[in-house]
């Protein structure tokens, strides 16, 4: 299998906090086919509303959210230190929440996945077949301006996702940059991750400082993550989930590690009672402008709606893929038939039956 040629920075992101569940729900309602709503950063979240019953109890915020839900979790590489750098969706995770809002399926798409990206008038993009990460960058352009709009990029990305997956509407989405995830993990006091293979960092020294870039590569001592359950602080969690070089399956191993990180964040959030909005508020506020969510719902509404979605009820799914090229040149990635089959099954609502017939897709 040819490894994806991608660079990482998250999330998301994962969006990787791009987490929707157990109160760290930062995906906010919007329609993928509609106009982008005004962006909201975590520091400007809606006023906190108590969910404690009163003498005349009103419906809890988020009580009207109904399943099933399809949420987009995006980790963005902004490279703000580089002039004219355009945002790239370096991590793309999709979370399908069942109708009862008590179980879900988490899966990743390669950022180099080759797809048809629709035309987008706001940025002047005429459409074409590209790596899906380019939907974020091409959509972010503002004609006549040097500025970039992450929110526009998100809108075009979700349109491309809808076209590829057949999922007509994504009810929520969130964008988190590299620094935001670092802050999130540290706000939680670190996370416990089960490291499934030895991983050497390309970017960090054992003390967390950056390795020296020389001649197009990094030199110096490397941080190393040994198999086993390890307590990781923010920079370690991000660094571990960032690595793809030297791994047997390259980016596909990295995608699995990122999903594992999301599960670890959810597990830690559960132990800290972050389904309680009063405890969730400081965590979200600490992310500041690192977190952007789009639309009219707040993280606190999703925190209530998904209060029963615990980590053990989230099935992580591995979608195998392979590189595609032309004339010896690399063009991107494509999912293998069984991976595409799962995507189609999600859109049709028969994913449980599909996984029963393809049990190897379920991460162990």
What are these regions (language model features)?
Residues 2-12, 20-364:
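Non-catalytic, solvent-exposed segments at the cell envelope interface
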């Amino acid at each position: 299998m040819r490894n994806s040629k991608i660079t990482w920075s998250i999330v998301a992101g994962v969006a990787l906090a791009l987490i929707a569940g157990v109160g760290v729900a930062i995906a906010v309602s919007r329609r993928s086919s509609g106009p982008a709503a005004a962006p909201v950063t975590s520091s400007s979240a809606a006023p906190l509303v108590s969910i404690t019953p009163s003498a005349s109890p009103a419906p809890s915020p988020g009580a009207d959210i109904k399943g099933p839900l399809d949420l987009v979790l995006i980790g963005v590489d902004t490279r703000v230190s580089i002039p004219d750098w355009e945002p790239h969706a370096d991590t793309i995770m999709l979370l399908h929440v069942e109708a009862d809002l008590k179980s879900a399926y988490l899966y990743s798409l390669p950022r180099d996945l080759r797809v048809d990206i629709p035309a987008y008038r706001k940025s002047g993009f005429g459409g074409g077949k590209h790596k899906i990460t380019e939907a974020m960058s091409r959509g972010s352009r503002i004609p006549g301006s040097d500025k970039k709009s992450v929110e526009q990029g998100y809108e075009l990305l979700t349109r491309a996702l809808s076209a590829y997956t057949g999922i007509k509407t994504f009810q929520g989405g969130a964008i988190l940059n590299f620094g935001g995830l670092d802050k999130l993990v540290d706000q939680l006091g670190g996370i416990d991750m089960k490291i499934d293979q030895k991983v050497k960092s390309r970017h960090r020294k054992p003390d967390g400082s950056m390795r020296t870039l020389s001649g197009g590569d990094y030199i110096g001592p490397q941080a190393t993550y040994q198999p086993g359950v390890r307590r990781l602080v923010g920079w370690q969690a991000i660094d571990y989930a960032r690595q793809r070089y030297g791994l047997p399956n390259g980016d596909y191993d990295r995608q699995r590690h990122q999903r594992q990180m999301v599960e670890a964040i959810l597990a830690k959030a559960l132990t800290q009672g972050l389904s309680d909005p009063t405890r969730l508020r400081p965590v979200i506020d600490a992310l500041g402008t690192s977190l952007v969510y789009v639309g009219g719902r707040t993280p606190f509404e999703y925190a209530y709606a998904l209060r029963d979605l615990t980590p053990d009820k989230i099935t992580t799914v591995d979608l195998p893929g392979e590189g595609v090229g032309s004339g010896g040149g690399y063009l991107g990635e494509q999912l293998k038939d069984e991976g595409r089959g799962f995507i189609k099954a999600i859109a049709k609502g028969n994913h449980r039956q599909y996984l029963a017939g393809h049990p190897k897709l379920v991460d162990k």
